[in-house]
UniProtKB/Swiss-Prot annotation:
GO terms for biological process: serine transport; threonine transport. Keywords: Amino-acid transport, Cell membrane, Membrane, Symport, Transmembrane, Transmembrane helix, Transport. This is Serine/threonine transporter SstT. It is a multi-pass membrane protein.
């Protein structure tokens, strides 16, 4: 027994989740009547639902309050690329939804009262009202729009406080993140329960939906990595971008695929920037910053799963509303940094725009965790490799302009 326990401790989370998916699948086929197994999935989703609003608030306050001013001029273009790249990734995900519309199988017996918006005007009205919600109520009711707004305000107000107090803020954010790590560490058990419930209630054919979901997610990320990002690079440098793109994917993306953490991949990216001969004064700032705000993969995940939920409930949205979703997803994705599965925890932010309740949104998050073995790895690979790519093309564009 001790050998089995030690082997389990040494096994990385990706393999554990894969094992959980397989066990849940087998139990759902062989023992569909043992419904108690499904409670494990409910507990896992419940724990995520409880900590997610506090996590978003703590991380955003910490990031804004510690943001430094006086960046050198070259950073301006890099930041613009980070934000533009994230928005374009979200927009590509919207287009992918129109080309390959997905639906999800959810338990709609739980709090299914939906209030779909009537076009862009009502969406803005709902957004503005949620912005001014009581901050305590926003945390308690999982009003993520309000949580983000108040976190931004508190972060800006705390920028001028003494460094000792900022350290306390960072400690609070670290503690909250650690709690999430503990919850994520039991993800294999929770996902086993989720897979069991899905298979036992809907049959084995339900897995074909997840296969299509994975294909759309990964396909969209590949399109951004191999078409959208190289196009941005070509527009700025007027050079063939693919040697640099493939170098970043090979040396940065491959490592990030397995670590599943942009923050953990920072040392790899710094070394790659040095190997590429980039300015140290620039990449020492841009790479850590990119790990926080360059979240194209996260924006794709948020939009694909949110729009799948929208399709599931038959909510009709116009293109302007979908465009607003891209903006919200891009902004929300910036809060996903440094947290395993962080993009999934921010799906309720986007779902709330369409009147989808928190309970149903967390079921969508549960679906995300089921496919997360592949989704999170590909997402991190895209995010982290793009940090180096945008840093490099910004510097190339800077020198090109200077020579001209």
């Amino acid at each position: 027994m001790k050998r089995i326990r030690d082997l389990w401790v040494r096994t990385n989370l990706i393999k554990k989740i894969g094992i959980g998916v397989v066990i849940g699948l087998l139990l759902g086929i062989l023992l569909p009547d043992v419904t108690a197994i499904g409670i494990l999935g409910q507990l896992f989703v419940g724990a995520l639902k409880a900590i997610a609003p506090l996590l978003v608030f703590a991380l955003v306050v910490q990031a804004i309050s510690h943001q430094r001013s006086g960046q050198q001029t070259n950073m301006t273009l890099i930041i613009v690329l980070y934000l533009l790249g994230t928005f374009l990734a979200a927009l590509v995900a919207v287009i992918a939804n129109y080309l390959f519309p997905l639906t999800l199988t959810l338990n709609t017996s739980v709090n299914t009262e939906l209030s779909p918006p009537q076009g862009i005007v009502q969406v803005f009205q709902t957004l503005l009202l949620k912005l001014v919600d009581n901050p305590i109520n926003a945390l308690a009711t999982a009003n993520y729009i309000g949580v983000l707004a108040w976190a931004l305000i508190f972060g800006l107000a705390l920028k001028s406080v003494p460094s000792d107090f900022k350290h306390l803020i960072k400690t609070a954010a670290d503690v909250t993140s650690q709690i999430v790590v503990w919850i994520i560490n039991v993800a294999p058990i929770g996902i086993m329960g989720l897979v069991f419930s899905t298979v036992s209630e809907n049959g084995i054919s339900i897995l074909s939906d997840y296969a299509l979901l994975i294909l759309v997610l990964v396909g969209t990320m590949l399109f951004v990595a191999l078409v959208v990002n190289p196009l941005l690079a070509f527009v700025l440098t007027h050079q063939n971008p693919y040697p640099l793109v493939f170098r970043c994917l090979k040396d940065s993306g491959l490592t990030a695929f397995f670590t599943r953490s942009s923050a953990a991949n920072i040392p790899v990216n710094l070394q790659l920037c040095e190997d590429l001969g980039l300015s140290q004064a620039t990449y020492l700032v841009s790479i850590p910053l990119g790990a926080m705000i360059n979240m194209g993969g996260a924006a794709i995940t948020i939009n694909v799963l949110t729009l799948a939920a929208v399709n599931t409930f038959g909510i009709q949205i116009d293109f302007l509303t979908a465009l607003l979703l891209s903006v919200v997803a891009a902004i929300s994705a910036c809060g996903a940094s440094g947290v395993t599965g962080g993009s999934l925890l921010l799906i309720p932010v986007a779902c709330s725009l369409f009147g989808i309740s928190s309970d149903l949104a967390m079921q969508v998050v549960g679906v995300g965790f089921i496919v997360g073995v592949i989704q999170d790895s590909c997402e991190t690979a895209l995010n982290s490799s793009t940090d180096v790519l945008f840093t490099a093309i910004a510097e190339k564009a800077f020198w090109k302009q200077k020579k001209a």
